[in-house]
Amino acid sequence: MEKPTIILATSNGVGMGHLARASAVALALKEVANPIIVSMAGGIAEIPDFMGIRCEYIPGKDRMWMSREKWDVYLRDRLLALAEETNAKVLSFDGVIPYPGVIAAKNANPDLKLVWVRRGLWQKKPQRFVLGLQSAMMDKVIEPGDIARAYDFGPTATRKEAVLTAPVSLFRKEDAMTREEARKALGLDLNRPTVLVQLGTGEGDVNEKMTAALSGLLGWKDLQVILTKAPVDKDGKSLAPEGLDLKVARYFPLAKVLHAFDAGICATGYNGVHELLPAQVPTVFVSNIRGTDDQEARARWCNDFGFALRADQADLADITAKVKMLQDPAVRQRLSAKCAELPDTTGGQEIANMLYQLATAPKGKKSSGLTYKRLLVQDRISRGSRHVIMLGLRRLALVYRFLHPHIKVQEIDQAPPVFGEQATAAELHPLIKSSTRFEHLISGASASYRKRREEIAFAAYGKETVITKTK
């Protein structure tokens, strides 16, 4: 029997959580199906090298290469074209909110089974009001387990439509490198103590948290500090105090080399918690309170039950003090030993099994046209007054052009996007980060698929408007 194709789509969320979960599911699917990962996250560049799985990068709406309305249609058409090209039976979406384009793809192709992998521990954000409508459009809703689920009091906690699995993680004891192997892979000294720092930079308070955390490492003899991104602000100014031996290292998946580290400092995202703690890395969590993820709830659970230390993200002195506690070998030993009690992270295999069952089932759920229309209306409302204002400004511009015919509007073709089937991180990273519009194709794409993709790109990017005044 031919292996079914399953598309695993992810949003461009904060951190690598969505992409890491999709990767764990894809690895579990490889023996029985043909998984394809599509994502708006730049980290997708690492997937082909690591997993040998076909993937496609989709530029997100945050690139601002087209209007929001055009991007919704663009995403729908990209997903439909990929499903037709690969004869995919299932489209799984891992993200906080299923984009209108994702749901529109299901509405346009009812035979395509749609699954929402919906992480729990939501903060009480406005997105909660459309949970029921979005869930009703799905063939299945799956909630990847969270070790801190007992502290989940958000809007998804009491809903009944989701199937709960064990936690999902790319960390697997049987695949992880030994301490020596991991340190050699990262180019580290084999004997010096080593700390991993996974904190973001950007806004002022985020930068201050990075500095506060690194300050807690001062005085740790012979320490080497590994960061996943350079500790600099937007102007290139260092956020690190003097006196630390710092190194920036990129390795995917980081889960394979976690045994290299004596301790970790990390945001309390799903991915960080479910990799560092199963790997028994003594960790201080500094929560990122932006976004939908209730990182503070997860951090409190980890701290209250002795699996990690929680730093008060609003108190820089507390961040420094909690990190300094990691210098005590007894503290590190206690945290590491406690983490051995955590449950197995087998959720990736559980989700893979459910997706495979759907892919081999005869028919999917027929979604309600009324539900879809209600969801469209709600989406318009949720975009709020800004959307209404923009529509009004467009109308005023049309009136102004009618009243002032001396202003001519000329439309010219924009430079065509770059199409390619690149499949290595070295090739993909520069293209994804570039200001040039990049249209990524799965390896082995057919001529008809490329033609369809060119049509989709032209419709989305269209023409550039140039206004010239003439007397």
Name every feature range the model reports, one short phrase each.
Residues 80-97, 439-443:
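Short N-terminal targeting/anchoring amphipathic segment
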Residues 2-14, 28-81, 312:
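Conserved nucleotide-sugar phosphate-binding/catalytic loop shared by glycosyltransferases and other
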